Amino acid sequence: MKRKKMKKLTAVVAPVLVMSMALTACSGSGEKDKASTTPKSGEKEGGKLAAKQVLNLTEAQEIPSMDSSKATDQVSFLALNNVMEGLYRLDKDNKATPGVAESYKKSDDGKKYTFTLNKNAKWSNGDPVTAKDFVYSWKRAVDKNTAAEYAYIMFDVKNAKAINEGKAPLDTLGVKAVDDYTLEVELENPVPYFVELTSFGTFYPLNEKFVKEKGEKFGLEADTTLYNGPFTLTDWKHEEGWKLKKNAQYWDNKTVKLEEINFNVVKDSGTRVNLYESGQIDRSGLVSEFVDKYKSNPDFYTQKTPSTFFLRLNQKRGGQDTVLKNKDLRLAIAKAYDKKGLTNVILNDGSTPADYLVPKEFAKSPDGKDFRKENGDILKTDVKKAKEHWEKAKKDLGKEQVTIELLNYDSDNAKKVGEFLKGELEKNLPGLTVNLKNQPFKQKLKLESDLDYDLSYAGWGPDYLDPMTFIDMFVTDGPHNQTGYSNPKYDEIVAKGKGELLTKTKERWDSLLKAEKMLLEDAAIAPLYQRGDAIVQKAKVKGIVHHPVGGDYSYKWAYIGDEK
């Protein structure tokens, strides 16, 4: 997650190949050129390799940061997933497979892990990757002076939360380098998905000497970042593009077939399609007007994703309550737009209307029931009720006219979504004026973090396979809350779900169902849709692996097949 992975998504938080929509596995970016790709149906791997192993792709947005402690969005995590590696990484079947770690042992109570590291793991400058690199990185992430939005994802590690809140010294973090190649980790509670969690970007190692040498420039340029993954980042020209090149120092470089991956930043969907048709790129996400054209093309396919998009409804701006503090106004907005029209006409890419936060077919209960089926649809479109809430809101606010701002991505597809929502809200809620504010991805993320907006078109993709990756976003003052929403009962449910209920799976599951209903009945956010991707990909492109959590896809196993 992906923030957003979980991650903030790009809009609309997905794909150039991908146009990375920042879901914050993460937050989303709002555009559909996402190259998140699993093999197309029937595609076989293991064919003959082409002489030239170069993949050409696009992204709709610039990389905001290559600092793994500070990254929060889908674009950054996607890049990091391919140039970095944690203790474990997700394999082609989305299962945890050894990365820097060769193996691990877990204590009987599930609260202590001992990882044995691979002595062949090296940084791109030739330095060995050691246990000390993980200790430094993890401490840096939870240090409140780092101001890492994703610090909370490490709160399962002993004392991480207390340290981040300034209530415990940094040296008490439950991570220890027993020797250069043995890492010991202590947890607050048993976490069944902890090994998988170590594949997430915030858990990546960092070379302390290099980070301190680069200072404030670390992670902002290709040559001020150090890599330990399958590729290295080069030729990073901001707002224009970048390259990934095979990392000769990577311990498993024999598996990597691609020599180079070229990314160009292209925000216009029509331009991307033209580049695809002219053979200048090998894969492209499609937006609505191009889907029908390509539906019968053998290069075309669609895929569902566990990412949801919604409107953030900011209740506090500039330290003052906004009109959106009024619950009736939030409910009016959340019920006033045509979700089917949005997904079927404006998007037309396999996305489906969402009356929920936690996506369909994402998480199952201890007895195998889908979370979404159990909790059903919660916040549905109902224009009649929206108007009733609108009248109550105007009365409570003492206003007949209300003007709000909708913060949006600056990609062409996201702009269409923004115009649609503006039209729906102004039509169905007479007296409401919605002013659109389209911003580059990085700036949009900053405005959200600063609570400097009214409405925001946003998305979220999961960071790990559990409903909590969506639900814990909206705790009071949570780093990804970014709405000013606060409900002590909601906070209590989340706290128990991340603590005492971890070993009481049925009770925990029921509490998460309750939390989602509470959040949406409060209209803390206004759901829009669950994202789908429509993609065209050249037949010669093989082996790109799509991940439901963390970085959207991996190129470690990708290659260009010989078409002869």
Which stretches of residues belong to each language-model region?
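Extracytoplasmic/peripheral linker and loop segments enriched in polar/acidic and small residues
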Residues: 431-444, 471-538, 563-564
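N-terminal lobe/hinge region of extracytoplasmic solute-binding protein
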Residues: 58-106, 226
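Long beta-strand-rich cores associated with HINT superfamily self-processing modules
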Residues: 535-564
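Structural transition elements
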Residues: 352-392, 413-415
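Ligand-site clamp/hinge motif
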Residues: 248-293
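Surface-exposed binding/hinge segments that line
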Residues: 149-208
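Alpha-helical secondary-structure segments
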Residues: 130-132, 136, 180-184, 229-230, ...
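Gly/Pro-rich hinge or "lid" segments in bacterial periplasmic/extracellular proteins
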Residues: 187-256, 260
